[in-house]
Amino acid sequence: MRVSISKSSVKGEVFAPSSKSYTHRAITLAALSNESIVRRPLLSADTLATIRASEMFGASVKREEENLIIHGFNGKPNVPDDVIDAANSGTTLRLMTAIAGLTDGITVLTGDSSLRTRPNGPLLKTLNQLGASACSTRGNEKAPLVVKGGLEGKKVSIEGSISSQFISALLIACPLAENSTTLSIIGKLKSRPYVDVTIEMLELAGVKIHTDENNGTKFIIPGKQKYDLKEYTIPGDFSSASYLLAAAAMTEGSEITVKNLFPSKQGDKLIIETLKQMGADITWDREAGIVTVRGGRKLKAVTFDAGATPDLVPTVAVLAAVAEGTSRIENAEHVRYKETDRLSALATELPKLGVKLKEEKDSLTITGGELKGAEVHGWDDHRIVMSLALAGMVAGNTTIDTTESVAISYPDFFEDMSNLGVKIKQISEE
């Protein structure tokens, strides 16, 4: 699908979509429990992949109004009767690969062409050390993956610099191992807030994880635990909301109120602080969960460390493109291992809109200026598409392709933007 975007501003109120990362974890922990209610889940392409995988392991998931009623398999996953297809979802693939280590048989997991390019080596290696048997069919650490159950607890270490999803997956599976597990992180743990979200959810499900007090890079996980997630309401998603907040900050005459943004462990709440640093007119009523942004102020350049919040990189890159001065997005090599190599995608597309940009191995240097309309490629990546849509609001006369990819995390993105006043036109494919 292609859309064209004209110069626009945004006005009005919008409810932030529910958090993708919390939804993935809530569904997974509910499947490992007996019976649970997950309230206000995000139902997107990625989270539907987690629902399908949970059902293949033996859970029953029913939708009732805005809730999911989940009858789980009580910590004993069945051997799936078919290949698990995680579609485009890295979280689904990684979490379910670890859960496959708890079965009495063999599980095969795969995904779409993009997911089959993403690395899984550290997770496979650690599962093998823990007594399961895990490999890639092509011997390249990428899906399709084959996992034979047999997970036992022991002392292991895992590389932390590629993806925090490997650590989250093991933190979820290891409490059901026969013995306790000690998991030590080697190197710098990237995207740490996502691990904190996992631990927060595990505690709510009655599962104990002891974190090493010094620097939080060692986890002691007692075995033979039981999951009991009763009921959980999914909070709003700061990653998805970042596009709404940035849209208002970037455009003259805009004023937007985004609801359902309460304080949480999400690292991407950093977008509020980043917008403040850049000089945006933004207020956050934490108790009410309401963020208000008024456009019109000239944004200033910023230095942004992407270590903990890789999903904000496309949003910050577009903010930098309209800010005064030269911004740097640093510590961002792990952003290359997402649905696409997002640093390369941004470095390819933003210059088409007139942006002066320098790409290095783990950074982008962006000098703000005037944007001009162009035809740009969305790279089949929801975050690239949504960030280019923001640039289009400023540049005008901008056409973006592969826009159907927003279904991964924010299915109503274009509808919400249109309701807020963005001039969007769908172009029929020839």
Swiss-Prot record:
Binding residue positions for phosphoenolpyruvate: K20, G90, R118, Q165, R342, R383
Gene Ontology MF terms: 3-phosphoshikimate 1-carboxyvinyltransferase activity
Pathways involved: Metabolic intermediate biosynthesis; chorismate biosynthesis
Principal subcellular localisation of the protein: cytoplasm
Active site, per annotation: D311
A GO-annotated cellular component: cytoplasm
Catalytic activity as recorded in UniProt: 3-phosphoshikimate + phosphoenolpyruvate = 5-O-(1-carboxyvinyl)-3-phosphoshikimate + phosphate
Residues bound to 3-phosphoshikimate: K20, S21, R25, S163, S164, Q165, S191, D311, K338
Subcellular location as annotated: Cytoplasm
GO biological process: amino acid biosynthetic process; aromatic amino acid family biosynthetic process; chorismate biosynthetic process
The entry's keywords: Amino-acid biosynthesis, Aromatic amino acid biosynthesis, Cytoplasm, Transferase
PANTHER family found in the cross-reference section: AROM/DEHYDROQUINATE SYNTHASE, PENTAFUNCTIONAL AROM POLYPEPTIDE
Protein family: Belongs to the EPSP synthase family.
The protein's role, per its UniProt record: Catalyzes the transfer of the enolpyruvyl moiety of phosphoenolpyruvate (PEP) to the 5-hydroxyl of shikimate-3-phosphate (S3P) to produce enolpyruvyl shikimate-3-phosphate and inorganic phosphate.
Summary of subunit composition and partner proteins: Monomer.
Descriptive protein name: 3-phosphoshikimate 1-carboxyvinyltransferase
